[in-house]
Regions:
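Extracellular and secretory-pathway beta-repeat/beta-biased strand scaffolds
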Residues: 1-443
Length: 443
């Protein structure tokens, strides 16, 4: 415990606790179960200088190695000055592997106003067969994961729990992994969020885990973003953002030996660029809900997810909940927006190649829908259903310059349609599934 702590060496406390705290007054609490908690009663104010009189930018810095197998590592600091760069700067390694059924734990707490930068490794993975993943908790005002590796993997056991909170901003530029025999749980909470790296909670022989994302403002995902909860049966992904989601990455909830999982994505404004969302399974398709529930949750007493106001999906997007094996029913996909939806891309809920019923797709809006997607719901006489039930609908070309021009104009913000709508009748050039329902009298 000191105003500033810098570790460049090796600290070992297997089955014990390594605690590093920056503050002028700190309370140590023995909370039971061999765990210790630190509370900063008074943070350090003003400058902190090294022995040579040089300004120290970080309250806690670790470029070395901290090891607490079967124990816990706690780094905690609070910011009371605008002078410092980071309250926690983690460029080295912290390992609290789970051993002999004793889960490891890593806690990095930067307080409500501190910046936390992680460019190293955090690891609470199981070390021997049968050891589950441990727990990792990271919290700060701004949390930057810069080519880091955060792992809580199970060794022939369940993955662990990883919770990361950036109250103003969270940037995921390094891999997060809670995979195991069955997947663990990953929770990301942020003011604003960017994802440019894999986030994994895969199950090798059991069910995939869960990834839950909550953002108060906006969420961006580039082509390097991968959210994967695949397993023998698929797990669950939820991305609930208040204002806007712009997605170009991949969401996977595959069932490699069973039914696909579930994917729920919603925000007031949704923009699906070149992204892939796949909840397919070898024995049954899963469920994908983008922007709302069936008919916008019209007949539900309590909505499970908020409705999007606008939704834009380019023709490069692929949304799939099909059966990848010979037997099984196709999945269920809902694409919804209260005000305006423009949906191109490809949607697939086809059943097994030999048996199984076709799946269900609803693409709609409480007001205006422009539709030019390619939708597959059935195979031969094993038909599925495509439901288009907006108040107003425009059927657009499912490819070529029409959909691309419309999507690009809408994405750039020059009016919702930019005058690029195409009024066409359904014909053989439009790729729909086996059955189409148009219901304009629902409202």
């Amino acid at each position: 415990i000191a105003p500033s702590v810098n570790n460049k060496g090796v600290v070992v406390a297997n089955l014990g606790t390594v605690g590093i705290a920056s503050g002028e007054a700190v309370t140590v609490d023995f909370v039971g179960n061999d765990l210790i908690a630190f509370a900063i009663d008074k943070s350090v104010e003003g400058q902190v200088l090294d022995k040579d009189g040089n300004l120290i930018n970080d309250r806690i810095s670790n470029s070395g190695s901290i090891q607490a197998k079967g124990g816990q590592a706690i780094l905690t600091a609070r910011n009371a000055s605008d002078i410092i760069k980071n309250v926690i700067n983690m460029e080295g390694r912290i390992e609290a592997h789970s051993v002999v059924k004793k889960d490891g734990r890593i806690f990095l707490g930067g307080g409500d106003e501190g910046n936390v930068n992680i460019a190293g490794n955090l690891n609470t993975s199981g070390e021997s067969s049968g050891d589950s993943g441990g727990e990792i908790f990271v919290q700060g005002a701004s949390v930057i994961l810069d080519k880091s590796l955060i792992q809580a993997k199970g060794k022939d056991a369940k993955g662990g729990d990883i919770t990361i909170t950036g109250t103003s901003w969270l940037s995921v530029g390094g891999q997060i992994d809670a995979s195991g025999d069955s997947g663990g749980n990953i929770k990301l909470t942020a003011g604003g969020l960017s994802i440019a790296a894999p986030i994994l909670a895969q199950g090798s022989t059991g069910q995939g885990g869960s990834i839950n994302i909550n953002s108060l403002s906006r969420s961006w995902e580039n082509v390097d973003a991968l959210l994967d909860v695949s397993g023998a049966t698929g797990g669950s992904i939820q991305n609930f953002t208040v204002q806007q989601i712009t997605a170009s990455g991949k969401y996977l909830a595959l069932g490699n030996d069973g039914k696909g999982g579930s994917i729920d994505v919603t925000a007031s404004s949704l923009k699906f660029m070149s992204n892939t969302m796949d909840a397919s399974g070898t024995k049954g398709g899963g469920t994908i809900r983008l922007g709302g529930e069936y008919q916008g949750g019209k007949n539900l007493s309590v909505d499970e997810i908020q409705n999007a106001e606008t939704l834009l999906m380019t023709d490069a997007a692929q949304i799939t909940a099909k059966v990848t094996g010979t037997e099984g029913d196709g999945g269920r996909i809902i694409v919804w927006a209260d005000q305006q939806a423009a949906v191109f891309g490809q949607i697939d809920v086809t059943p097994g190649t030999q048996t199984g019923a076709g799946g269900f797709v609803e693409v709609s809006s409480a007001d205006t829908l422009t539709f030019g997607a390619k939708v597959l719901t059935g195979i031969n006489d094993r038909t599925g259903t495509l439901l288009l039930d907006p108040k107003n609908i425009t059927i657009a070309s499912s490819g070529g310059n029409g959909s691309g021009a419309f999507s690009l104009t809408a994405m750039m913000g020059s009016g919702y349609s930019g005058g690029k709508n195409f009024n066409q009748s359904l014909d053989t050039r439009d790729n729909f599934g086996a059955s189409v329902s148009l219901d304009g009298n629902r409202l």
